[in-house]
């Protein structure tokens, strides 16, 4: 009934029908191996296009190279101190740079990534407890809802850190989360789709400067500059410039 179907690739002939309709062509995967010259791939080649309106105000497609994705994963994994023992709960869309970064950092260090298509905020809390999650990333609208829930005390023994990006974390929400999860380290992050993350505020600095975007991620340089390109003074609004 698939009238538009033109090609079918069979990976394994076992269990496949001997006869096929004439409306489409059947190709055997094994017979195709080596028939097409291998294309040389370099780290500057495009790996993904992520769509965002965060940096310009208008939707656009951000082209990311393989090198860009790997570099972003390495930087985030370094300051979060990720290891193969970590278990990350992925609740954000993978089409979102913040969501995709959960997978890439897990792949980089060999950690476990648990995918969750949640309907209610409580589903997230239950999954953290059930899968003994060590790292959870979310955006402010979700954190606002999670801060109102009762977190099982057992979570305190394994939820090592939480991260926020995609907007500023309200102070009262952060206070509620820290009260509910006293042994969990919160990382407040700021970033552009082009760079995955640009800055992060270490947990040790939150009490001293809770409204700061923090410092540059590893292997990157950050400046806040005026229209003429000169560096801004502390507290002076300006344009964020990222290199790395």
PLM regions: where:
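Conserved AMP-binding/adenylation subdomain of ANL enzymes
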Residues: 70-87, 94-135, 149
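Gly/Ser/Thr-rich phosphate-binding loop
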Residues: 133-138, 147-209, 218-221, 231
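Conserved S/T- and glycine-rich ATP-binding loop of Class I adenylate-forming
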Residues: 46, 52-55, 88, 94, ...
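Conserved pre-ATP/AMP-binding loop-to-beta segment of ANL
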Residues: 32-51, 58, 81-87
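ANL superfamily adenylate-forming
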Residues: 2-43
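Conserved beta-loop-beta connector loops within the AMP-binding
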Residues: 223-243
């Amino acid at each position: 009934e698939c009238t538009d179907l033109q090609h079918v690739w069979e990976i394994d002939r076992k269990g496949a029908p001997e006869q096929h309709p004439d409306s489409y062509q059947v190709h055997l995967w094994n017979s195709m191996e080596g028939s097409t010259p291998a294309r040389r791939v370099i780290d500057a080649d495009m790996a993904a296009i992520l769509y965002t309106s965060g940096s310009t105000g208008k939707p656009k497609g951000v082209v990311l190279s393989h090198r860009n994705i790997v570099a972003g994963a390495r930087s985030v994994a370094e300051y979060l101190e990720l290891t193969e023992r970590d278990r990350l709960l992925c609740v954000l869309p993978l089409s979102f740079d913040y969501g995709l970064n959960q997978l890439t950092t897990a792949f980089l260090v060999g950690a476990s990534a648990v995918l969750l298509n949640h309907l209610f905020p409580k589903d997230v809390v239950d999954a953290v407890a059930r899968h003994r999650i060590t790292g959870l990333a979310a955006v402010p609208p979700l954190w606002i809802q999670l801060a109102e829930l009762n977190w099982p005390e057992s979570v305190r023994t394994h939820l090592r850190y939480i991260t926020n990006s995609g907007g500023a974390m309200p102070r009262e929400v952060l206070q509620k989360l820290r009260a509910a999860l006293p042994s969990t380290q919160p990382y407040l992050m700021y970033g552009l789709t082009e760079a995955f993350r640009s800055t992060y505020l270490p947990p040790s600095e939150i009490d001293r400067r809770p409204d700061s975007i923090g410092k540059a991620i590893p292997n990157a340089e950050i400046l806040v500059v005026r229209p003429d390109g000169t560096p801004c003074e502390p507290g002076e609004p300006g344009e964020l410039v990222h290199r790395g």
